Amino acid sequence: MESVAYIVVLTMALAVLFFAIAFREPPRIQK
C-alpha cells in the first residue's frame, strides 16, 4: 500500500505545480 500513498503524493505535488503555474501566468487557454 506504500505505492498507493506515493502515487497520491506525486499527484498532489503535480496538481500544486500546475495550479501555481496556471494562476501565476495570465490565462491564455480559454474555450
From Swiss-Prot:
Q: Name one Pfam family in it.
A: PsbT
- GO BP field: photosynthesis
Q: Does the keyword Thylakoid apply?
A: yes
Q: What is its main location?
A: membrane
NCBIfam families of this UniProt entry? PRK11875.1
Instruction: Name the job this protein performs.
Output: Found at the monomer-monomer interface of the photosystem II (PS II) dimer, plays a role in assembly and dimerization of PSII. PSII is a light-driven water plastoquinone oxidoreductase, using light energy to abstract electrons from H(2)O, generating a proton gradient subsequently used for ATP formation.
Family, as annotated: Belongs to the PsbT family.
Complexes and interactors: PSII is composed of 1 copy each of membrane proteins PsbA, PsbB, PsbC, PsbD, PsbE, PsbF, PsbH, PsbI, PsbJ, PsbK, PsbL, PsbM, PsbT, PsbX, PsbY, PsbZ, Psb30/Ycf12, peripheral proteins PsbO, CyanoQ (PsbQ), PsbU, PsbV and a large number of cofactors. It forms dimeric complexes.
What protein does this entry describe? Photosystem II reaction center protein T
Which species is this record about?
Crocosphaera subtropica (strain ATCC 51142 / BH68)
Gene name for this UniProt entry: psbT
